[in-house]
């Protein structure tokens, strides 16, 4: 291989994947009009998917870098899968909670103006580019583990 043995492809993919996960923790995931953007690091306290996700994504990022530096790329299966599962879980929980608020706000006998405002804002919520950063980081970790597995099976 054209890379030095200490910086083989699985190690580099693991390092860059971990760095992307760490960067993705601060990147905007969801934009809600008037309220602003949510990320794993900037979110309301009652949005538990991001509270837990913050710890999970940053731990996966840190462990991925450590595993890559220790040249243990097979362990990146774990961190990549956990990061991807956390991202999917966050998006599913947000969609479920947003749909519940919108359904409650659409009731004909509702007189709560805050609930009507929240329902209207959530109808126009959209996903942002931070999702792609976290997803690409997780996929890079899985690719690093796959490369290491392929290299180990050839030997």
Name the predicted role of every residue range:
Residues 1-155:
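Compact integral membrane and secretory-pathway proteins
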